[in-house]
Amino acid sequence: SRIGPGLVVLLGVSRADGSGQARKVADRIHKLRIFGDDEGRMNEALGDREVLCVSQFTLYADTTSGNRPGYREAEPGETAEPLYEEVCELLGARRGVFGADMEVEITGDGPVTITLEV
């Protein structure tokens, strides 16, 4: 998938996330004022811009011990996928293939990277 100006959402689902999280996440993403206005200040929300969602369980990597990350905080794929799909639907997002190895090319404006926990 390819998008024009907008957001790339790397979406991880944790074991603590429940079914109500999808709407909270999508609402938060829609309302975040992270796009530049006419003066270059982060003052505009998503609006009509496009969204690309990529599933990213590695966001919940535990690197506190050893040399190999653990992923016990990440929700297993079979239960994470429905929440991922719901967030994508609510955002009207294009998406990558859930759980697949993909080559993702991101051209950032800024760049700006924001971690959002709800």
Feature roles, as predicted:
Residues 66-74:
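Short hinge/gating elements
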